[in-house]
């Protein structure tokens, strides 16, 4: 399977590559597919929950906990307590 253009683009530009188009490679940054995505549904979110050596979103964690106490991906016990490691972004209240 190669890259295919629509008939309109081929008629206008021929079979040559269009200038300014950047080819997609498999060397994507880890942020697009890596550890900060839910390994069950690949949802990207800052509110992911650590499970073993990967992360799960709250929806997938809830679904897995309704079926079993162990992770379906890494077979380790699922987290039952959420620990927030980031400090609040708002400044402290000073009256």
Swiss-Prot record:
It is found in: Virion; Host cytoplasm, Host perinuclear region; Host cell membrane. Keywords: Host cell membrane, Host cytoplasm, Host membrane, Host-virus interaction, Lipoprotein, Membrane, Metal-binding, Myristate, Viral budding, Viral budding via the host ESCRT complexes, Viral release from host cell, Virion, Zinc, Zinc-finger. A lipid is attached at residue 2 (N-myristoyl glycine). A zinc finger (RING-type) spans 38-74. Myristoylation is required for the role of RING finger protein Z in assembly and budding. Belongs to the arenaviridae Z protein family. Interacts with protein NP; this interaction probably directs the encapsidated genome to budding sites. Interacts (via RING domain) with polymerase L; this interaction inhibits viral transcription and replication, Z partially blocks the product exit tunnel for the releasing nascent RNA product. Interacts with the glycoprotein complex; this interaction plays a role in virion budding. Interacts with host eIF4E; this interaction results in eIF4E reduced affinity for its substrate, the 5'-m7 G cap structure. Plays a crucial role in virion assembly and budding. Expressed late in the virus life cycle, it acts as an inhibitor of viral transcription and RNA synthesis by interacting with the viral polymerase L. Presumably recruits the NP encapsidated genome to cellular membranes at budding sites via direct interaction with NP. Plays critical roles in the final steps of viral release by interacting with host TSG101, a member of the vacuolar protein-sorting pathway and using other cellular host proteins involved in vesicle formation pathway. This is RING finger protein Z. It comes from Allpahuayo mammarenavirus (isolate Rat/Peru/CLHP-2472/1997) (ALLV). The lineage of its organism: Viruses, Riboviria, Orthornavirae, Negarnaviricota, Polyploviricotina.
